[in-house]
């Protein structure tokens, strides 16, 4: 089960890198940042506008951890979209970390036997499943819809152009449905996910658009398509 815990995975080494990047060699600046870290925790430092650009600049040299990199990328993308929600950023960063491993994106959980390559397979599973597993299938419907539409928008657009698949509105609708149903389930609050899933459902198109920006900048930076040009103009 994916949890909103990316910040909890950050290490002392991650925070030392943040201090290094924000201080830029200034001992006075570093001492000030260390005092702020001790007094307020890491959140204000992770929110620093200049941190994102500096992480991108040193990415190939210092190799920031995936946890630090994804959290900062997602957090800043969400804030740019008008979504100031650290718990949601925690959740989405954890989603990217987990779904990037082997075939995790096709399973509702690491140890689940069924693999779902298509959203219709998840819908079929949802209709046939009861109990606690039904909640996990609901969450996975939201997760998988967001992962596909958030990170691979050009692939979706190309398939739609060839009349081989639906457009992004289909993914938005199913993603909102999955997260919405899951947020109303009794297990949502037990897992500490009620508010996160509710926000993801209510703001799904904006969250997806924020991940489009992460995809454009990090995963497919050299690709130029008509769809990307429209996104750059704010037309989604």
Show where each model-derived region lies:
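Polar/charged low-complexity regulatory segments
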Residues: 1-235
């Amino acid at each position: 089960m994916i949890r909103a815990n990316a910040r909890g995975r950050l290490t002392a080494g991650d925070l030392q890198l943040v201090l290094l990047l924000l201080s830029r060699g200034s001992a006075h600046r570093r001492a000030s940042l260390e005092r702020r870290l001790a007094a307020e925790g890491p959140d204000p430092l992770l929110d620093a506008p200049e941190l994102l650009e500096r992480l991108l600049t040193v990415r190939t040299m210092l190799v920031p951890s995936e946890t630090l990199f994804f959290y900062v990328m997602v957090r800043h993308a969400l804030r740019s979209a008008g979504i100031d929600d650290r718990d949601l950023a925690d959740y989405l960063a954890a989603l990217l970390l987990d779904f990037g491993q082997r075939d995790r994106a096709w399973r509702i959980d690491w140890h689940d036997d069924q693999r779902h390559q298509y959203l219709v397979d998840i819908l079929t599973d949802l209709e046939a499943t009861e109990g606690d597993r039904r909640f996990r299938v609901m969450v996975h419907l939201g997760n998988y819809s967001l992962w596909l539409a958030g990170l691979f928008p050009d692939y979706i657009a190309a398939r739609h152009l060839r009349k081989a698949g639906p457009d992004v509105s289909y993914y938005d609708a199913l993603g909102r449905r999955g997260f919405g149903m899951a947020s109303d389930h009794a297990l949502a609050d037990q897992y500490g996910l009620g508010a996160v899933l509710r926000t993801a459902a209510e703001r799904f198109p904006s969250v997806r658009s924020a991940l489009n920006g992460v995809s454009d900048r990090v995963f497919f930076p050299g690709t130029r398509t008509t769809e990307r040009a429209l996104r750059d103009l704010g037309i989604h």
